[in-house]
Amino acid sequence: MHVKKDDIVVVISGKDKGKKGKILHAIPKKERIIVEGVNMVTKHQKPTQQSQQGGIIKQEAAIHVSNVLLWDKKANQGVRAGHKVLENGEKVRVSKKTGEVLD
């Protein structure tokens, strides 16, 4: 996957197109991610022993990783990410548009 936990991403398709958020959780096997404040769903929760409160709660649902782009602070927009190996052998992600290191 071209993104990982704690990256800032922008949604490029779907009902939340244009929203920006931080990745809370990544699910590599299913190629899905959970982004803060994106794809909110309503869930009816029963009271349990651990959490006494029940009721209707809103929480983030997973979206496919192809629906997001990494956010480049310098370019102030979403960019595609590529990989590059530096002279010291370190592998980093770079912006395909500007060539700047994103990590």
Curated annotation (Swiss-Prot):
InterPro entries: KOW, Rib_uL2_dom2, Ribosomal_uL24, Ribosomal_uL24_CS, Ribosomal_uL24_KOW, Translation_prot_SH3-like_sf. GO terms for cellular component: ribonucleoprotein complex; ribosome. CDD domains: KOW_RPL26. The keyword Magnesium does not apply. Keywords: Ribonucleoprotein, Ribosomal protein, RNA-binding, rRNA-binding. HAMAP family: Ribosomal_uL24_B. One of two assembly initiator proteins, it binds directly to the 5'-end of the 23S rRNA, where it nucleates assembly of the 50S subunit. Belongs to the universal ribosomal protein uL24 family. This is Large ribosomal subunit protein uL24. The lineage of its organism: Bacteria, Bacillati, Bacillota, Clostridia, Peptostreptococcales.
